Amino acid sequence: MPADMKVLHEREFSEVWLRDYTDEPYFRIYHTLEKVEATNLDEYRVETAVVSDIPRIVRIINDSYANISVTCDQIREYTKTEVYQPALWIKAVHCANGKIVGCGMADFDSEMQEGIIEWIQVLPEYRGKKIGQMLVNELLLRMKPMARFATVSGQVNNLSSPEKLYRKCGFVGNDIWHILTKKT
């Protein structure tokens, strides 16, 4: 971790830190995997993503965020990690035209038996159609045979309110972490 950063749990955090640091709070919530239901949508289907989908996945990620930009090389590097599981990289495909309109990427930590949702993206023009919910629930169903539980984290102040999506899919908890960056 860079010397100008600190990560504090909510229990350790106080407003005093804000004199010298900027704060970006993140939620971290979990799912027991006991009750997971598929979200079936007539117009969209889920498929396992393959390495040749990476350029399209990168476009979806970059088109979904104003402040994040990833490259194909960065995403390919994820496939070389110990927690990479090919079955946990999925895409939402429009049935009528075959267009990839969303994607989901998750990891599996075999030591902890934990499924970790890393990315859920839906192109802005396709949001509000339950595609995100379909992707999250599909990942949870795929994790269920291998994991004891699943986790996800995200920015508390994200304008797209990802925490609401995850809670609709059965995630619970109230863990908040603060990423503090030294003011210059």
Q: What are the residue ranges of the model-derived segments?
A:
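Conserved GNAT acetyl-CoA-binding A-motif
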Residues: 1-7, 143-155
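Conserved acetyl-CoA-binding loop-helix of GNAT-fold acetyltransferases
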Residues: 122, 128-144, 163-168
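A conserved beta-strand-loop-helix scaffold within acyl/acetyltransferase catalytic domains
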Residues: 67-122
